[in-house]
Amino acid sequence: MKQRGVTIWLTGLSGAGKSTITEALAQKLREQDYPLEVLDGDVVRTNLTKGLGFSKEDRDENIRRIGFVCNLLTRHGVFVLVSAISPYREIREEVRGKIGDFVEVFVNAPLAVCEQRDVKGLYKRARAGEIKSFTGIDDPYEPPLNPEVECRTDLEELDESVNKILHKLDQLGYLR
C-alpha cells in the first residue's frame, strides 16, 4: 500500500519554536523512514518567493506558493513539514482546502516569551521602528481557531510538543 502524504503546517509568532519543533519532528520521522521534506519560511523566502515583501497580499502569495509545493509533494506520499509564521487565518484555510491532507499545528507562546527568545533582534528592531509590518508588533497574527494540535512552548518541553504531533498523525492514520 502506498504511503499517504500529509502537510504538517506549523504556524505561530517569530520565536514561538516552529523551527525547533520542525527539526525535532523531522528527525523522528526520518528515523522511521518516512519520505519527508521541510519547507522553512526563511529558506522559502530566499529561494521560492524571493522578491515578495511583507504586505498582506505578498504574505498571502508567499503562503499560496508554499501551499502549491506542499500539494504536489503531499499527493506523492511525502510528509511535508512547513514552518512559517503564516499570520492570516483565511489564507491558511485556503491552503488547507487545496491540500486536503493537512494538519495544522499552532505553536503558541506569549509575545513576551517570543521577544525573550529573539536571537536575531527582530522584535527589538520592530519596536524601534526599523522593521515595518512585523507580525505581533504592528501587524496582526490570527491564531488558528481549531488547530489539530496546539503546542504551548512556554509550558511544555520539546519532546512533549513533538509527541503530541506524532500522536495526532497516528490518530489520523498517517503513521504506519
Swiss-Prot record:
Keyword ATP-binding on entry: yes
NCBIfam families assigned: apsK (TIGR00455), PRK00889.1 (NF002059), PRK03846.1 (NF003013)
Annotated GO biological process: hydrogen sulfide biosynthetic process; sulfate assimilation via adenylyl sulfate reduction; sulfate assimilation, phosphoadenylyl sulfate reduction by phosphoadenylyl-sulfate reductase (thioredoxin)
Annotated function: Catalyzes the synthesis of activated sulfate.
CDD domains referenced in this protein's UniProt entry, alphabetically: APSK (cd02027)
EC number assigned by the record: 2.7.1.25
Highest taxon, organism lineage: Bacteria
Alphabetized InterPro entries for the sequence: APS_kinase, P-loop_NTPase, Sulf_AdTrans/APS_kinase
Sequence similarity: Belongs to the APS kinase family.
Upper taxonomic lineage: Bacteria, Bacillati, Cyanobacteriota, Cyanophyceae, Oscillatoriophycideae
Enzyme class: transferase
One Pfam assignment: APS_kinase
GO terms of molecular function: adenylylsulfate kinase activity; ATP binding; sulfate adenylyltransferase (ATP) activity
Associated pathway: Sulfur metabolism; hydrogen sulfide biosynthesis; sulfite from sulfate: step 2/3
UniProt-annotated catalytic positions: S86
Protein name (database record): Adenylyl-sulfate kinase
Keywords: ATP-binding, Kinase, Nucleotide-binding, Phosphoprotein, Transferase
CC annotations in GO: cytoplasm
Catalysed transformations (reactions): adenosine 5'-phosphosulfate + ATP = 3'-phosphoadenylyl sulfate + ADP + H(+)
